[in-house]
Amino acid sequence: MIGRRSLELKTAPQLLAMQRAGVVLSEALDAALAGAPGFTTAELDAVFAVVLAERGATSNFLGYYDFPASICTSVNEEVVHGIP
């Protein structure tokens, strides 16, 4: 809480929205486990895109400053903001 003097309590609707988002993410991560060696980051992105669409969810990344994918993913030595 750097720079804050109080704790913001979430409302019941905010907590429900957070719970729903967590469930969608959990389902997307479970679906991604279907990936095997040789599974590309583009294929992983496609899995996430399908799960999000089926649940009526959207990606925070897709379209943000023209980012072309639903997920940011990096492999090996890449650290951040990898494009599948």
UniProtKB/Swiss-Prot annotation:
Gene3D superfamilies: Creatinase/methionine aminopeptidase superfamily (3.90.230.10). GO terms for cellular component: cytosol. One of its GO terms (molecular function) is metalloaminopeptidase activity. This is Uncharacterized protein in adk 3'region. The lineage of its organism: Bacteria, Bacillati, Actinomycetota, Actinomycetes, Micrococcales.
